[in-house]
Amino acid sequence: MCEKIQKILARHGYGSRRYIESLIKSHSVKINDEVVKVGQRISINVIQKVIINNNNYKPKLNINKSLKVLLYNKPEGEICTRKDQRNRRTIFEKLPKLSNARWINIGRLDLNSSGLLLFTTDGELAYRLTHPSFNIERIYKVRVFGQFTENILKQLNVRVKLLDGYANFKSIQFKYGEGKNKWFNVSLCEGRHRIVRRIWEKLGFQVNKLVRISYAHLTLPKTLFPGTWITLNKHDIDVLCKKVNLR
C-alpha cells in the first residue's frame, strides 16, 4: 500500500509531520537518492535509503513497534525548541536519550507557562494529537488578574474574535481567589499559539500564572516535580492512539 512520504517518515520517528513537510518543501529529503515532493506517495517496502538535510539514515521501519510516550512536567523558563540561539534552557535537555529515534513534543507551552507536556517517538501520533479535527481536550489552571463582574463572567463562555479567528473556552470553572487575583480551570480542544492567554487578554485580563494540568485522558501527577518525567504504560498509550484512530 502506498502512503504519503511525510506520513510514513513521521510515523517511524523522523520527526513530526509538519517538520518533515517543511523539510520536503525545502528539497531537503531524499528517498532512495531521489528528492521527494510534498504529497508524494510510496510503498514503505521499497524504502532502502533515507537522506534528510544531507544526513544518511538507515530506514527505521519497525520503530513504531516500540512506540514510546513521556509525560513531562515542564517548568517555567524552558523553551519549546531543540536549540535556542539565546542559549535558554529547552524542554529536551532533561529527557532520556534515545539510540534509534528522537523525541517529538506533542504541542507546546510558552516560556512562562508550565505543566503537562507529552513527548513521543511517533510523529504521526504527535500530529494527530495536536490537530483540532480530533478534538483533544486540554485543561489549564490559570491565575487571572483583573476586575471581575457578573457580565464579564458570562462573556467567558462566548466566542471572542482574535487576529487568527474566533476562539472560546470549552468550559470554565472558578476555583478560588479574592480581590483581583482569581484562579480558574479552563479547557479547550485546540492549541493555537498562546490561545488561553489571548482569550483572557481580549476580555481585558492578564494571566500571570498558567499550568496545563490535563491533556486527553492524562492528568499531571501531583507527585511529579517540575523538570521530571514518567514513561506512559501500554494502556495509556493505547488509549491515546485510539482517540486519534491509530489503533
Swiss-Prot record:
InterPro entries the record matches: PsdUridine_s_RsuA/RluB/E/F_cat, PsdUridine_synth_cat_dom_sf, PsdUridine_synth_RsuA/RluA, PsdUridine_synth_RsuA/RluB/E/F, PsdUridine_synth_RsuA/RluB_CS, RsuA_PseudoU_synthase, S4_RNA-bd, S4_RNA-bd_sf
Keyword Ribosomal protein: no
The entry's keywords: Isomerase, RNA-binding, rRNA processing
Entry EC no(s): 5.4.99.22
Residues of the active site: D110 (nucleophile)
Residues of the S4 RNA-binding domain: 3-73
Catalytic activity: uridine(2605) in 23S rRNA = pseudouridine(2605) in 23S rRNA
Pfam families: PseudoU_synth_2 (PF00849), S4 (PF01479)
Organism domain of life: Bacteria
GO terms, molecular function: 23S rRNA pseudouridine(2605) synthase activity; RNA binding
Example GO BP: enzyme-directed rRNA pseudouridine synthesis
Family membership: Belongs to the pseudouridine synthase RsuA family.
Function: Responsible for synthesis of pseudouridine from uracil-2605 in 23S ribosomal RNA.
Protein name: Ribosomal large subunit pseudouridine synthase B
